[in-house]
Amino acid sequence: MSANQHAASGKKITFTEHAREAMVKRELDEESAIEAVNNPDELFLNRRTGRTVAVKRDDQALVAVYDAVNDHLEVVTVFKTSKPDKLIRRKLDKGHWVRVG
């Protein structure tokens, strides 16, 4: 997928250099990250950074963290976790994340 892939909101989705490096290192593809952004199973706001955290559940959960920047969404990192409930509970309990969807 190219950087002009659109989110469900109609906004263009781009990836930071860090996100691209993380996807290569973690053997993840853009399509999976875009799917997480477009169709998350759960959505959170990181209160520290103001970024949106999209969680897409499968065998392992894919987490895509992104910013809304003017006319586009910029994915800043992507990772998989085998323990999404533990991650989410910890972030919510510490007040780092709030559920938005």
Functional labels for PLM-detected ranges:
Residues 1-101:
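Ribonuclease/tRNase effector modules and their secretory precursors
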